[in-house]
Amino acid sequence: MDKKVIIIIVITLFFVLKKIRKIIGPLLLVLVFLFLFNNIKNIKSFFQTPKNEESTYSFLTLKNSDINTKENLKNKKIGYIESFMPVEIDEYVLKSYDANNIYNVLLKKEVDAIYISDSYLSVLKEEYKDILEQTKIVEEEKVENVILATESKNRDIINIFISGTDSKKEKITSKSRSDVNIILTVNTKKNKVLITSIPRDYYVELFSNKKDKLTHCGVYGITVCTETLNKLLDIEINYFLKINMNAFTKVIDLLNGITLKDGTKLTSEEALKYVRERYSYKEGDRKRVENNQDILEEIIKSFIRNKSLLLNYKDILESLNGYYMTNIDENLIVEVIKNLLLGKSLKIERQILNGFDSYDTTYSIPNKKLYVMLPDDKSLETAREKLKNMLP
């Protein structure tokens, strides 16, 4: 049967024969599964997207060093950031350092070179404006980091970490700052969704009890982000979805724009400005986080209202290729699509973690006090309680 014919039949059943849904229920179920079965290859295309992060690691030496090739590094002393040595390098003398010392030990010539990722080099550029003039890259290596999904202890509850990068140029597989941080908690049994947003500047505990902004977690990888949020919220994140600005604007274009609760219609570029702007608001990033939730909720509702979007998901996924990465299980996607096609209602709730404005040093940029948001214990406890209430 032609795909378009199936789409017409299913939409007709939904919108013309609503009053006799009980009678056609079994037939509708068959048609839904027919559609999913006939298009299972299209679903699988979603899961052929990147699931692993890639990093470029560089051997960095001082500009006036006589080390110019990787061969020159043999038997030399190499510094690396503690807990972040992605490969075994036997031919070098290795020594680990905290992130706050890694560049200083090179400047003081305590090591001959340092081994760091491109994502952390971008952070160092903020603190040391002349780092590229003072150093040179001897060798670069591509390293792939596997990101495993965590099986839920309760199959009815799924926690998905959504990470949004503030870039259109970076490869989606590159480690980068996480400017949008959302936990999407889905109760598949009750058809409930809880959107939990955490501000980018939230002052959180990373590995080894080090404090940093949440946005900097992304520099060290998605796994560090999820582990940090698991600890903060006392939850278990099962999957991740990482998107960039291209993915965002393309989804809005596919929806022919987005309409806010107050009736304001936004184009994709206007919506992008709406979710990025924070300096013009008195509430700053708090307002930006709220705007992010507005758009995400409307996107979810748009898919629920317009079943044809679900039926044409192949085109949607193909148009987003290269702009997102995920390790979401295909069975979960099939379950969600099936429930929405069968007309099951979805209750959406939302919450935003709050805190207090402050300035403090961070693990990533230790020699300079940056703006951070100190967690409000009451807000944190309320958020944890809401997440627990999502359990069956």
Locations of regions flagged by a protein language model:
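Membrane-embedded alpha-helical segments of integral membrane proteins
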Residues: M1-K18
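Hydrophobic membrane-insertion alpha-helices, especially the h-region
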Residues: I24-F37
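Hydrophobic alpha-helical transmembrane segments in integral membrane proteins
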Residues: L36-T49
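Non-catalytic, solvent-exposed segments at the cell envelope interface
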Residues: F47-N52, L60-N64, K70, K74-P392
